[in-house]
Amino acid sequence: MLFLKLVASVLALMTIVPAQAGLIGKRSVFKPKVMIINMFSLEANAWLSQMDDLYANNITVVGLNRLYPQVHCNTQQTICQMTTGEGKSNAASSIMALTLSPKFDLTETFFLISGIAGINPYAASLGSVGVARFAVDIDLINSVDLRELPSYFQSSGWEIDTDPYENGSSNEIVYPESMPYQTNLYELNNTLITAAMEIIKDVVLEDNEKAASYRKLYNESAARRPPFITQCDTATGDNYWAGTYMGDFVSNITNVLTNSTGHYCTTQQEDNASLTALTRASFDGLVNINRVVIMRSGSDFDRGAGNITALANLLNSTGHVSSLACDNLYHAGAPLIDHIVNHWSYWT
């Protein structure tokens, strides 16, 4: 009986090992032209279900999120996809694990960070896609509960290494004397962003009745538009926030840190962390930080409309259109990926 079990185990291994050996035999090191980075399963499925052949190669990488332990690549190994897990910690650790993996050569790879986000109704509408030039970390602040601050304070937070009394009773956010964390602000390659926008600017995005109906509650002209693609900037914070006061605070931080060249429109939980990992990898020549594009699609508004309170807006699933937002990430990103892969000399 023991002998039969041993034979069965050996036969089982014989069926598994050749498949693994075949995969490595094709190419011991994967060198994709594009790496798609998603944060959770709904975003990933929009790509894996619509882009052909991404399950052709499934590469387990040490250090990835246990929920998403594999990188998926097409047959030609030109396009790959990974999922980091949500939040800064997951994003930074997963991307660092990828860049350090000996299974990949990412020195010439373009990275497309593709995820859903809260959206500023003054900048865009549900289902719209924002392509960011700046990523601002809104967690790196001093903060005191408003109930324990003087009444003239406009928000409960202000930039670290600044004096909240510098402008007297106005309590305006001011530019910090230094940025000791070095991750407060990232500016992406504007030449790349401009080229990407030129390719995707006329893409027609999907819409649905749910999104259209909810948009009508808002007075802002951008919020009432059908989904569209725009160049605007993104704010990173682990807190899932909502409300006009928080929205104004995030807009103010973006304006100050970018010297009024940035325009906040999307809020999410990962991008500064992802860029930190990619930047460190770039320092050592493992990736090229100038080859990163961030696309974020609005799944919900960052503040309520009319009499809808911030709390109601945050908890109200009626105004959330995550599936539409994920589909539009694919519709906006796929033409760019196609152009990069099929016109490689243009991009390099």
From Swiss-Prot:
Signal peptide: 1-21
GO CC terms, sorted: endoplasmic reticulum; membrane
Subcellular localization(s) per the UniProt record: Endoplasmic reticulum
Pfam families (UniProt xref): NUP
Keyword Transport applies: yes
One MF annotation (Gene Ontology) recorded for this entry: purine nucleoside transmembrane transporter activity
GO BP, one annotated term: nucleoside metabolic process
Domain of life the protein comes from: Eukaryota
Protein keywords: Endoplasmic reticulum, Signal, Transport
Main location: endoplasmic reticulum
PANTHER family the record matches: PURINE NUCLEOSIDE PERMEASE C285.05-RELATED
Assigned protein family: Belongs to the NUP family.
UniProt function note: Probable nucleoside permease that transports adenosine and guanosine.
Protein name from the UniProt record: Probable purine nucleoside permease C285.05
Organism: Schizosaccharomyces pombe (strain 972 / ATCC 24843)
Lineage: Eukaryota, Fungi, Dikarya, Ascomycota, Taphrinomycotina
